[in-house]
A protein has these predicted regions:
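Conserved Rossmann-like nucleotide-cofactor binding loop
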Residues: 14, 37, 159
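Glycine-rich FAD pyrophosphate-binding loop
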Residues: 23-43
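A glycine-rich dinucleotide-binding beta-alpha-beta segment and adjacent secondary-structure elements
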Residues: 248-263
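FAD-binding beta-loop-beta segment adjacent to the flavin cofactor pocket
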Residues: 259-284
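Predominantly flavin-linked oxidoreductase catalytic cores and closely associated redox partners
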Residues: 11, 25, 109-249, 267, ...
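A conserved beta-strand/loop capping segment in the N-terminal third of enzymes
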Residues: 51-106
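Glycine-rich phosphate/pyrophosphate-binding beta-alpha loops
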Residues: 43-46, 208, 281-284
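Beta1/beta-strand and adjacent pyrophosphate-binding region of the FAD-binding site
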Residues: 1-14
Length: 284
């Protein structure tokens, strides 16, 4: 049986940052991810604030920055249109739209350079508590294996299985999880360069629609809805939105992403014996 100080399950930004800093502080770290490629498929609109990167001590790199955001356009349910400009008002949304597939790999590589080991195509299937640690059962490339860790960090996304196995309450009610669908599109008509657009109202019941620019005519166009507020799927709402919104009527999709987004906020319990959860797994 393999042994390590810290086993981190999930190599998204939260998992990779945890791996990096644990390794920098002298821990033996193993970071695993169930996918064969870290960062793929992307799971969000790819926006990040400058303040967020600064807090994480991540230096912006043109290799993973698609565009810089300095304006926000808000469209209310009654159609009122408000443009907020960084030059006139402080905006928490000011930052970048990323290439998440590149960004996530960049963070994982930083963790590796700090001393963390990484295993891809590795799925955690169960775990058992012992007095001095946790035994985690894994499947690596379809082959079973076991790892004993002093600490397990669950960075495995919404409704974390790691948290549930540890007895933490990570389940979410339907009203606490938005269903999301997003196209990356080309041919988007964006009137304001560097402007993030948020559209509220019936286009996305219980949530909102977004346009995150990634280039001159390229953008992530998506929305999130609450299943308690609509009988349609997020994908159906997305198709209706891109067909009717002026900036996207002539655009074409080159990628589709679907998934869930927790909106309930931070879970009450994040830590138990030898286990903690972080990132979306913790409701962050």
């Amino acid at each position: 049986m393999l042994e390590t100080d810290i086993l981190i399950i999930g190599a998204g930004p939260a998992g990779s940052m945890a791996a990096k800093h644990a390794a920098l502080n002298g821990a033996e770290v193993l970071l695993i991810d169930r996918k064969s490629e870290i960062g793929s498929p992307k799971r969000c609109a790819e926006g990040v604030s400058k303040d967020g990167l600064k807090r994480l001590e991540v230096t912006p790199d043109p290799r993973w920055i698609a565009s810089e955001i300095n304006k926000v356009r808000l469209v209310s349910p009654n159609g009122t249109d408000v443009l907020l400009d960084e030059d006139k008002v402080k905006l928490s949304e000011v930052g970048y739209v990323l290439e998440r597939k590149v960004f996530d790999k960049h963070l994982a590589m930083d963790a590796a350079r700090a001393g963390a080991q990484i295993m891809v195509k590795t799925l955690a299937t169960s775990m058992e508590k012992e007095k001095d640690g946790i035994i985690v059962h894994l499947e690596h490339m379809g082959n079973p294996m076991e790892i004993k860790a002093k600490i397990v960090i669950g960075a495995d996304g919404p409704e974390s299985r790691v948290g549930r196995w540890a007895g933490l309450k990570t389940g979410l009610k339907p009203g606490n999880m938005e269903s999301c669908a997003q196209f990356e599109m080309v041919g988007v008509d964006m009137k304001q360069p560097g402007c993030l657009e948020l559209v509220f109202g019936s286009v996305a019941p219980g949530g909102y629609a977004w346009i995150f620019p990634k280039g001159e005519d390229i953008a992530n166009v998506g929305l999130g809805v609450l299943s308690t507020k609509t009988d349609k799927t997020a994908y159906q709402h997305l198709l209706e939105f891109v067909d009717t919104y002026p900036g996207t009527q002539k655009a074409q999709p080159v990628e589709l992403n679907v998934g869930g987004d927790p909106v309930a906020g931070l879970h009450k319990e994040l830590v138990t014996d030898h286990v903690l959860i972080t990132g979306d797994a913790a409701g962050m």
